UniProtKB/Swiss-Prot annotation:
Zn(2+) binds at C131, C134, C182, C185. NAD(+) binds at residues 27-47, 105-108, 223-225, 249-251, 267. NAD-dependent protein deacetylase which modulates the activities of several enzymes which are inactive in their acetylated form. The keyword Nucleus does not apply. Pfam families: SIR2 (PF02146). Its cofactor is Zn(2+). The keyword Repressor does not apply. Coiled coil: none annotated. InterPro entries: DHS-like_NAD/FAD-binding_dom, NAD-dep_sirtuin_deacylases, Sirtuin, Sirtuin_cat_small_dom_sf, Sirtuin_class_II, Ssirtuin_cat_dom. The gene is cobB3. The lineage of its organism: Bacteria, Pseudomonadati, Pseudomonadota, Gammaproteobacteria, Pseudomonadales. Belongs to the sirtuin family. Class II subfamily. This is NAD-dependent protein deacetylase 3.
């Protein structure tokens, strides 16, 4: 249940969104209700082990072996995840032309599953795999089937789920792992089609996001601490243009000083309420 102070803030947000065309940017917090772990605590501090860096992944075969061994065990959770009420609420708002567009930092494709159109996937998608040699893309399901067939020794191994389809796997299981091959060129330098730490967002994706900010009259940030520059810069640009930036997020965000309003309540409760109010009025 949403308490009275939260409902007062939400009513103010409803009035603002009824008057202005808002762009929405989402982060890991919108998918936690779908069973996908997020990255940071309420103070914006990253949980768990440090992520693999792009240069390490590209330049070190052992790093790729480690990544894919862990990712093979993490994929079933990602592939089975279902969009939750927050994803569906944003899809409903978009269908009624009540939001200007949708940008996500998430790589789980749950916005698309919920029915959202033309989602800008700022950091890519785990549902695709890119070959670093021939640049062809493959469906993640096909790569998963290949890895399972070649690494039967991991079939019954349990590993704790981590963000972005990663797992906490005992290193003893990694050494014998056979990395997947590209179905197009048989190369062994496959990478999930996502932006790693230390890697730049594709220029065409960044340009689409920038244009979306320019065309919108306000920005609604959902479920993200905005610690990644790729998303924070959008808030900064919006605020510099004198447009309102509003957040629905538990805890600290990098953009707190830029926010007109912050609602600290579960997005899977807040967004359905907001959608119902905006659509029925």
């Amino acid at each position: 249940m949403l308490d009275s102070p939260t409902l007062d803030l939400l009513d103010s947000l409803r009035r603002t969104m009824a008057e202005k065309s808002f762009l929405v940017v989402t982060g890991a917090g919108i998918s936690t209700a779908s069973g996908i772990p997020d990255y940071r605590d309420k103070d914006g501090v990253r949980r768990g082990a440090q992520p693999m860096m792009y240069q390490e992944f590209v330049g070190n075969p052992a790093a790729r072996q480690r990544y894919w061994a862990r990712a093979m065990l993490g994929w079933p959770r990602i592939s089975a995840s279902q969009a939750n009420a927050a994803h569906r609420a944003l899809a409903a708002l978009q269908a009624e032309n009540l939001i200007k567009g949708l940008i996500t930092q998430n790589v789980d494709a749950l916005h698309t599953q919920a029915g959202s159109q033309d989602v800008i996937e700022l950091h890519g998608s785990l549902h695709r795999v890119l070959c670093l040699d021939c640049q062809q893309r493959s469906d993640r399901t096909a790569i998963q089937e290949q890895m399972l067939a070649h690494n039967l020794y991991l079939a019954d191994v349990h590993a704790t789920q981590a963000p972005d389809g990663d797992t906490l796997l005992d290193p003893a299981y990694e050494a014998g792992f056979k990395v997947p091959e590209c179905p197009h060129c048989q190369g062994k330098r496959l990478k999930p089609d996502v932006v790693f730490f230390g890697e730049n967002v594709a220029s065409h994706t960044a340009a689409r996001a920038t244009l979306s900010v320019e065309q919108a009259e306000g920005l609604l940030v959902v479920g993200t601490s905005l610690m990644a520059w790729s998303a924070f810069r959008l808030c900064k640009a919006m605020a510099e243009q004198g447009k309102p930036v509003i957040a629905i997020n538990h805890g600290k965000t990098r953009a707190d000083e830029l926010l007109r309003m912050k609602i600290e309540a579960p997005c899977e409760q807040v967004l359905p309420w907001l959608a119902e109010q905006l659509i029925t009025r």
